[in-house]
């Protein structure tokens, strides 16, 4: 069954080297019970590790069931260990966070097979007399009971080979004999047992005793009454490993990952806290940015689309500005001439502004008075939500009618309907015909603190102005803004006899550019806020990586155990990645809840415009998962790269 020829193994310790095995050759038949003895440093444990496929020889041949295994890959050896061998260790190597039955089931996770593993585990526990303690943790059991659990674990895959490394080394005489009784029974059932011990009385339970010294076999004797009851191979050495991402396999890894996470609650919480804060910051910051953007979009709608603003320039005498309109003064005829430009212009409205004192009964309010034309309502999204807009006749007749902004309406009328009420504007009676839609603030200015009246009424009855303060022009399309600007510029220069190089007499402002600038600014602020929050996510990810590296160091023996019972490199890496992603995802989910809560509080108590978007939730969640993958990769690779024998020896 087992044949090794001229096997050598040398360990390097600093600059010196120690030859643990020096040309060892031996054959072990199927169904034998072999004890390997020797003093400390004799090479017996090294031989056991090579026979158990936990280590590979430097030179020589190792044939197991007729197949050369000494040059197989790590994953191939893992498959054979899982399918053919069972291990019993001196230190038991039970996982303290798992119950007895879960410890026994552990090798089945890496088998790639399906079945009622817990039922099989209970049978194995019953064989060793511990079925009634299947739900206990290792720390609730004696040393002898823990070793019996380890034997049950070694038997769960029904292996042909049992490797027992000092199985009684940490037990008293009574428990030692109990363990040896179990091993003897297994031998009678046909198992091939290879045991390392330094105790002569324990070695006497075996049918064959191999003694080693200084890396060579010095004695190999069999009992006269040795009996072989070989177990027939059940499927040979073919590993039953399945695809790494098989659903049942992944589920087992996920369950174990969260068991590991839950076993260190405080440390896990502190690790997750960084991700939690990062995700909550991303959600809250992006909610602020999205809310600001939505608020800005509402304000931009109130400004109208494809809009040009034509204003008189300011003359300069001795470098001093003389004020707007001192050079070029626009009249209603200028507005009409602009309206007549063919194929480019949709709407035009003259505009005059001033201040006014409004009075209704015992209430008064100082506000801005804006005289506008018929088309202004459509151009600037000012059509009343309550009441109506001016008619052309009212503008021609200089009618004393007014449309109130929502702030003015609230100050004068509260919740009452102001339509058809009579108010005074600068001591002149006006009839309220409507309330304009709310526009909000544009910077520090309240756009709803205004009263609209016909431009003719404002000029000749209220403000006493002979000229327009400006002209608003709505261009037919965004593509026509440039040609419309050129046409208006040429028209004004012609009408007012201005030189081609005169840049001070008037200006044409493209409100679309202003809108784009505001949108770009808002977008930049949103990105800046999101970037700042993302930094905290990265810092949280570094914290996760640090904890995972510590976890790899602390769990080195566990990693060695998992590899000994059949875990491949990919299995180890995947489990640690799942743990890392599990922590970041948990932090991400809690962070989403906290972030949304903070956003709601900012909106409710600070009055800030916030809007939580699904995009920010998906982004934060996805980013937290990526953080877990990225920062968990190094610890996972480090864990996967550990050699089984080195990991099991780790102190």
From Swiss-Prot:
It holds the Pfam family MacB_PCD. Gene3D superfamilies: P-loop containing nucleotide triphosphate hydrolases. SUPFAM superfamilies: P-loop containing nucleoside triphosphate hydrolases (SSF52540). Keywords: Antibiotic resistance, ATP-binding, Cell inner membrane, Cell membrane, Membrane, Nucleotide-binding, Translocase, Transmembrane, Transmembrane helix, Transport. The keyword Transmembrane applies. It is found in: Cell inner membrane. Signal peptide: none annotated. This is Macrolide export ATP-binding/permease protein MacB. The gene is macB.
């Amino acid at each position: 069954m087992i044949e090794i020829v001229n096997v050598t193994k040398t360990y390097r310790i600093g600059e010196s080297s120690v030859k643990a095995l020096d040309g060892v050759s031996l054959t072990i038949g199927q169904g034998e019970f072999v004890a390997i003895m020797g003093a400390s440093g004799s090479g017996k444990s090294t031989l056991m590790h090579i026979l158990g496929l936990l280590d590979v020889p430097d030179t020589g041949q190792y044939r197991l069931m007729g197949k050369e295994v000494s040059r197989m890959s790590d994953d191939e050896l893992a498959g054979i260990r899982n399918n053919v061998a069972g291990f019993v260790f001196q230190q038991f190597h039970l996982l303290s966070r798992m119950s007895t039955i879960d410890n026994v089931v552990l090798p089945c996770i890496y088998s790639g097979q399906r079945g009622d593993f817990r039922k099989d585990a209970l049978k194995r526990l019953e064989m060793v007399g511990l079925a009634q303690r299947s739900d206990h943790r290792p720390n609730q059991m004696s040393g002898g009971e823990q070793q019996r659990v380890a034997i049950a674990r070694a038997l769960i895959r029904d292996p042909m080979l049992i490797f027992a490394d000092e199985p009684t080394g940490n037990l008293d005489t009574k428990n030692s004999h109990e363990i040896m009784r179990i091993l003897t029974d297994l031998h009678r059932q046909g198992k091939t047992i290879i045991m390392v011990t330094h105790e002569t009385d324990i070695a006497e339970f075996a049918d064959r005793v191999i003694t080693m010294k200084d890396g060579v076999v010095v004695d190999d004797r069999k009992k006269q009454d040795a009996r072989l009851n070989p177990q027939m191979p059940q499927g040979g050495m073919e590993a039953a490993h399945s695809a790494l991402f098989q659903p049942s396999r992944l589920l087992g890894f996920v369950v174990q990952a969260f068991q590991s996470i839950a076993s260190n609650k405080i440390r896990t919480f502190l690790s997750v806290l960084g991700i939690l804060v990062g995700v909550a910051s991303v959600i809250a910051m992006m909610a602020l940015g999205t809310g600001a953007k939505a608020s800005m979009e509402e304000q931009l709608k109130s400004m109208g689309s494809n809009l040009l603003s034509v204003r008189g320039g300011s003359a300069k005498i001795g470098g001093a500005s003389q004020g707007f309109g001192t050079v070029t003064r626009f009249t209603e005829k200028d507005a009409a001439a602009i309206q007549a430009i063919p194929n480019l212009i949709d709407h035009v409205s003259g505009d005059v502004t001033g201040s006014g004192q409004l009075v209704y009964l015992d209430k008064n309010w100082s506000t801005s008075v804006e005289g506008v034309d018929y088309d202004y309502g459509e151009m600037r999204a000012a059509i009343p939500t309550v009441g109506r807009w001016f008619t052309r006749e009212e503008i021609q007749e200089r009618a004393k009618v007014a449309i109130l902004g929502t702030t003015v309406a609230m100050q004068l009328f509260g919740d009452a309907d102001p339509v058809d009420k009579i108010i005074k504007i600068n001591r002149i009676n006006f009839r309220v015909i409507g309330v304009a839609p709310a526009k909000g603030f544009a910077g520090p200015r309240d756009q709803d603190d205004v009263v609209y009246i016909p431009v003719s009424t404002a000029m000749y009855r209220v403000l006493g102005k002979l000229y327009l303060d400006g002209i608003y022009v709505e261009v037919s399309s965004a593509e026509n803004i440039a040609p419309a600007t050129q046409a208006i510029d040429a028209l004004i220069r012609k009408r007012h006899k201005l030189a081609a190089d005169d840049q001070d007499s008037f200006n044409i402002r493209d409100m679309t550019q202003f809108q784009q600038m505001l949108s770009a600014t808002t977008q930049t602020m949103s990105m800046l806020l999101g970037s700042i929050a993302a930094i905290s996510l990265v810092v949280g990810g570094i914290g996760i990586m640090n904890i995972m590296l510590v976890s790899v160091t602390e769990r080195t023996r566990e990693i060695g155990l998992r590899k000994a019972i059949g875990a491949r490199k990919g299995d180890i890496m995947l489990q640690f990645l799942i743990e890392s992603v599990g922590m970041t995802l948990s932090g991400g989910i809690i962070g989403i809840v906290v972030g949304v809560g903070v956003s709601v509080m900012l909106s409710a108590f600070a009055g800030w415009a916030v809007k939580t978007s699904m995009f920010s939730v998906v982004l934060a969640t996805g980013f937290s998962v990526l953080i877990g993958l990225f920062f968990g990769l190094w610890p996972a690779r480090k864990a996967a790269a550990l050699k089984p024998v080195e990991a099991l020896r780790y102190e």
